[in-house]
């Protein structure tokens, strides 16, 4: 997910995206805790995507 794609979305769409990413992060953490997660780099990718979405939401709210 690129930041340029996210800037074109509305705040409502970004909030929906954020909710989906948080759910995905939860599922990945549960898989990691039970030893089922083989691609541990996915945790890092999702965490950074959450940060991207939150940053753009904050910038749009301030504008």
From Swiss-Prot:
GO CC annotations? cytosolic large ribosomal subunit
The family database entries (Pfam families) matched by this protein are listed as: Ribosomal_L29
Work out whether the entry's keyword set contains Transcription regulation.
no
For biological process, the GO terms are: translation
Alphabetically, the GO molecular function entries are: structural constituent of ribosome
Does the keyword Ribosomal protein feature in the UniProt annotation? yes
Matching PROSITE patterns, A to Z? RIBOSOMAL_L29
Keywords, in A-Z order: Ribonucleoprotein, Ribosomal protein
Q: Which family does it belong to?
A: Belongs to the universal ribosomal protein uL29 family.
PANTHER family given in the database record: 60S RIBOSOMAL PROTEIN L35/50S RIBOSOMAL PROTEIN L29 (PTHR10916), LARGE RIBOSOMAL SUBUNIT PROTEIN UL29C (PTHR10916:SF0)
According to UniProt, the name of this protein is Large ribosomal subunit protein uL29
Recorded source organism is: Shewanella loihica (strain ATCC BAA-1088 / PV-4)
């Amino acid at each position: 997910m690129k930041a340029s794609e996210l800037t074109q979305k509305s705040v409502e769409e970004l909030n929906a995206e954020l909710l989906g990413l948080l759910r995905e992060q939860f599922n990945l953490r549960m898989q990691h805790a039970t030893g089922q997660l083989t691609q541990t780099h996915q945790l890092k990718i999702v965490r950074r995507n959450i940060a991207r979405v939150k940053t753009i939401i904050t910038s749009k709210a301030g504008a």
